[in-house]
């Protein structure tokens, strides 16, 4: 895909653009976006900057390339707590009750600012139910805001119905694709899905981590036009 601007609008009103390149974009490292008038260091927000068009609408038929991408709503809270779940949810008691799947929201701050997996192995997962079949075109991840804990790599599963088996997102060789994630607590790393996923349920499967599996995230929805 040629370089261009990913035009996106968060549901809470912040409007802006992501720069699309042929590789994953680390928007907290090489490109830092913040709408806060006095951003704090070293925590770097991965917000959308002001100043672009107001984009809306999405494409239900999967394109090979997505011309526009819109945040699904983790950060804005348009994605509600009942849409996000995780492995071993019934064991999130005591201290872990503050670090449940619902806390896996991009740019979350304060105590309980991320999802922390209670167990550190590759059997863990973070799941999103988008409530209807959508075209998902990208994933943005961050680590834990207040400690050096993050996910370094992951795979993706999806399905259109809860009664169907999970399907792994594959690479061009037919193997399960490995997505590379974070290398610090605050930078945002964006991985675009080419082709995008047409699905209702999405799972992130952590394959590597620093100290502990810790995730803040956003999903990107594919749109065919900006209106």
Enumerate the language-model features and the residues they cover:
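Disordered, acidic Ser/Thr/Pro-rich linker "stalks" and the adjacent N-terminal cap
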Residues: 2-131, 171-182, 227
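Signature of small four-pass
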Residues: 129, 136-142, 154, 159
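A broad, structure-centric signal for solvent-exposed, well-ordered loop/edge residues
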Residues: 86, 91-93, 137, 163, ...
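A short beta-strand element within beta-rich, extracytoplasmic domains
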Residues: 84, 135-146, 204
